[in-house]
C-alpha cells in the first residue's frame, strides 16, 4: 500500500519516522528512503533477538523530546520503551494526536517479549503518555482511538490485574508450571 502511494498527493515525502525495529515496522524504511531519497529517523536496536530488524540504521537517531518540523506542524518524539527498547511515539500538538506505533493498539493488548521488552518500562511509558494533551490515538495497528486517558488507564489496570493473578497463583500454589502461568497471564 505504501509503495503505491509513492508519488501520489497522499504521500509525505520528506522523511520516514520509524517507531521501532520489529520486523513488521522497519524493514521497508530503507527501500522507501532510497526510492524517495529521504532520510530515516529512529533509534538503533539495543537487543539482538529474533523479533528485531537488525539491518535498520537510521540516518538520524531520535532522542526523547526531539522536534521534527514540517511547514504545517511539528512532531515531538516521545521515547516509550516497553514493547521494544527503542520504541517511539510521535505527538502532533496542532492535531491533538499521539501516533503510538505498537505502544497502544486498537483491538488487542501489546506483546511485551523478553529480552527486548520490559513490562516495567511499558507501564512507565504509558504513564508518560498521560502527561501529554491529546484527544486521539493513532495506533500502528487498528483504527484511531478517542478518550486516550480512559484507554491508557484501562491498559494499565488490565496489565496490573494480569500480574496480580499470576502473583496470587504463585503465592497459593506449591508448584505451577510455566505454561499454566502464561495461560493465566493471558486471561
Model regions: which residues?
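Short internal beta-strands
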Residues: 16, 39-45
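Metal-dependent catalytic neighborhoods of phosphoester/phosphodiester hydrolases
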Residues: 27-36, 52-53
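Metallo-beta-lactamase
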Residues: 14-24, 74-172, 178
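A short helix->loop->beta-strand "cap" motif at the edges of active sites that frequently abuts
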Residues: 36-39, 134
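Short acidic-hydrophobic, aromatic-tinged amphipathic segments that line or gate anion-handling sites
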Residues: 60-63
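Short acidic, hydrophobic short linear motifs in intrinsically disordered regions
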Residues: 175-187
Amino acid at each position: 500500500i505504501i509503495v503505491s502511494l509513492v508519488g501520489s498527493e497522499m504521500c509525505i515525502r520528506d522523511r520516514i519516522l520509524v517507531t521501532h525495529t520489529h520486523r513488521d515496522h522497519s524493514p521497508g524504511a530503507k527501500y522507501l528512503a532510497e526510492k524517495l531519497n529521504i532520510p530515516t529517523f529512529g533509534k538503533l536496536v539495543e537487543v539482538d533477538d529474533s523479533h528485531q530488524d537488525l539491518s535498520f540504521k537510521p540516518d538520524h537517531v531520535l532522542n526523547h523530546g526531539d522536534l521534527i518540523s514540517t511547514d504545517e506542524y511539528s512532531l515531538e518524539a516521545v521515547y516509550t520503551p516497553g514493547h521494544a527498547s527503542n520504541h517511539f511515539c510521535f505527538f502532533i500538538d496542532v492535531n491533538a494526536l499521539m501516533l503510538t506505533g505498537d505502544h497502544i493498539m486498537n483491538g488487542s493488548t501489546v506483546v511485551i517479549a523478553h529480552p527486548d521488552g520490559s513490562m516495567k518500562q511499558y507501564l512507565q511509558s504509558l504513564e508518560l503518555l498521560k502527561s501529554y494533551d491529546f484527544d486521539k490515538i493513532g495506533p500502528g495497528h487498528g483504527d484511531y482511538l478517542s478518550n486516550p486517558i480512559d484507554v491508557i488507564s484501562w491498559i494499565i489496570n488490565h496489565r496490573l490485574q494480569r500480574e496480580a493473578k499470576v502473583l496470587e497463583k504463585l503465592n497459593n500454589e506449591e508448584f505451577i508450571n510455566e505454561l499454566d502461568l502464561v495461560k493465566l497471564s493471558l486471561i
